[in-house]
Amino acid sequence: MEDYSNLSLKSIPKRTCRIIFRTATILGICTLIVLCSSILHEIIHLDVSSGLMDSDDSQQGIIQPIIESLKSLIALANQILYNVAIIIPLKIDSIETVIFSALKDMHTGSMSNTNCTPGNLLLHDAAYINGINKFLVLKSYNGTPKYGPLLNIPSFIPSATSPNGCTRIPSFSLIKTHWCYTHNVMLGDCLDFTTSNQYLAMGIIQQSAAAFPIFRTMKTIYLSDGINRKSCSVTAIPGGCVLYCYVATRSEKEDYATTDLAELRLAFYYYNDTFIERVISLPNTTGQWATINPAVGSGIYHLGFILFPVYGGLISGTPSYNKQSSRYFIPKHPNITCAGNSSEQAAAARSSYVIRYHSNRLIQSAVLICPLSDMHTARCNLVMFNNSQVMMGAEGRLYVIDNNLYYYQRSSSWWSASLFYRINTDFSKGIPPIIEAQWVPSYQVPRPGVMPCNATSFCPANCITGVYADVWPLNDPEPTSQNALNPNYRFAGAFLRNESNRTNPTFYTASASALLNTTGFNNTNHKAAYTSSTCFKNTGTQKIYCLIIIEMGSSLLGEFQIIPFLRELIP
């Protein structure tokens, strides 16, 4: 029986069809231009002596048919352009959905009667395939999206099973065919360097009998091999998942103090149970970076590359440090007046990247870039963000939405609102020298933090605080001009609604300037930590759903339990 387990979008030759059709169209248009030129040439060189041009009537008799022919040719060219630009791409998307659906039906139907287990194709229900990693409402939408009630779904996230256990650091990645998920299982307590194992799973979205989505786990692997993987980030790729971790042998503070880089590991886990793990060595990092950490949030698969968000500490006096130390980003809140003049504020913003607590390292954000074709080698590169465009390095997440790249950065420094950027770097030409980003102006949502960088802080200061709480953009956040607020931008997720403590997890929808809709739990003092949100659409019913994963405090089994919450989002 044919194996569909490694099915990917690349297996459908839609790009080839588009290239052939567009080439033929261009050739056709060129032919029309040549014909038109030839006709005009003949008109100019008509033989007057022949008597054909002796009267206005005879001239009209010759020119009129030519004009009518030209009109027909122009109309034909316009129709061809319309078909290429609009009709053909829509039909290709429709055909793609039909093919995926047919493959799934075939695999779970008659073929399952022979050698296959029903439902074993790693592919979402057809209703969700084209509603993933898309903007879910129009760019012009300016309404107030609201959440429906919590939907009772079976949890795909296993919890701790002993009072001393702890599950933490969830990472979730969703692509058109399947999802990948991972978290850390700490065996004693919730300290960063406690001995731990790593849980990794992949699965699909299915439609429940109640007509809402459920997350079905198809494969799991529990990495319990004595390797203390930490801060892991996951990325879904065609046919499987990639896990990026560092190996902890000391505390985070000790990691920054030393110049001996911790071991970095990249693991490939495929639906056919293949598991390949490599220790990676990054060029131009030894002696320049004190520590390199996966940024927890999920990475992306883009143009043949696997990209993971990264942060760490640059060593003073090194080329990388010197390159970035003069750069700083200083967003402004229109309703906040900060102390000091502009020069003093700029100096405070520049110094906010260097943290005394972390041995005066410059805390830097970056992207790990690995060609998927080289998964059997350890060839990857680390590319830094331009610090003139992003805040101090922190945990983060990468997104591909409607073929655009975005980056969420945890607000660990003085700016308390969520940080979201458009990545403007072109990866089609290979690995870039630096990552260029454009901030999406927003003054929401806040996160708890210590003074002087608490939830209402918007003035430059030196601190490292906050909590990871990524956002999901519901429509295109593109500003109308550089650093101008987009009044129609809408996003969703969950945050900890407290000035300084990690308590009161709250679901929200927001614009760039205001919280639009919030709903929390009865106990506003309930302990919580990281939150991660992913929204998608059922293209059959046009309903939008948001999966919001929250580290919830537990008083019974472990300090934290990771809970997936599913809600319908009503525009």
From Swiss-Prot:
Residues 1-25 are intravirion. It is found in: Virion membrane; Host cell membrane. It catalyses: Hydrolysis of alpha-(2->3)-, alpha-(2->6)-, alpha-(2->8)- glycosidic linkages of terminal sialic acid residues in oligosaccharides, glycoproteins, glycolipids, colominic acid and synthetic substrates. The keyword Transmembrane applies. Residues 393-398 are annotated as: Sialic receptor-binding site. InterPro entries: Hemagglutn-neuramid, Hemagglutn/HN, Sialidase_sf. Residues 228-233 are annotated as: Important for neuraminidase activity. Homotetramer; composed of disulfide-linked homodimers. Interacts with F protein trimer. The C-terminus (head domain) is involved in binding the cellular receptor. This is Hemagglutinin-neuraminidase. It comes from Human parainfluenza 2 virus (strain Toshiba). The lineage of its organism: Viruses, Riboviria, Orthornavirae, Negarnaviricota, Haploviricotina. The gene is HN.
